[in-house]
């Protein structure tokens, strides 16, 4: 076996390993109405980035472009676990993204919404969904769509006088909860593992 052949095999193996490592946890955070609010998502994105999560904040109006980007990067092996986070209208459109991804059988490992309103049900490709809202305010509880086998939590913050629709996404306490959820998810799960298990039942 020649040294040149061995070197070629080693190079291919190295490229394969680099491609595997390139699959990263991706978090996309969607601002509320027209992108004028939801400044707290910038801070949450920084906190997620500090945990090693590739995070970016976008305006909710461009959610269809976000779907295209996710499908492209996932096909290229760049996305492992996928996290969608949205505030207000951004929460609604985070769910819209999940529905669009369901068509292509792409799982969403974690969906977090802050006080969405008038939203669609959570689709079956979502593994874990957390909704922070205030009963009697603008936000509403999330409901599961047909075929949903993930875990859905609606957390009512109506009794917290320090939280409103306009600052809920900036709460340090809620950020800490989201960060803990992300950390636990990355330690215990592979991308979409729970979703695949649910489909086998």
Where in this protein do the model-derived segments appear?
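Active-site catalytic motif of lipid deacylating hydrolases and related acyltransferases
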Residues: 23-80, 164
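Bacterial N-terminal signal peptides that target proteins for export
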Residues: 1-7
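Lipolytic serine-hydrolase domain surface
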Residues: 27, 41-42, 124-201
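Sec/Tat signal peptide C-region and signal peptidase I cleavage site
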Residues: 16-23
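Bacterial N-terminal signal peptides
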Residues: 7-16
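Gly/Ala-rich beta-loop-alpha elbow adjacent to hydrolase catalytic centers
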Residues: 86-90, 94
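Short glycine-enriched nucleophile-adjacent loop
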Residues: 94-102
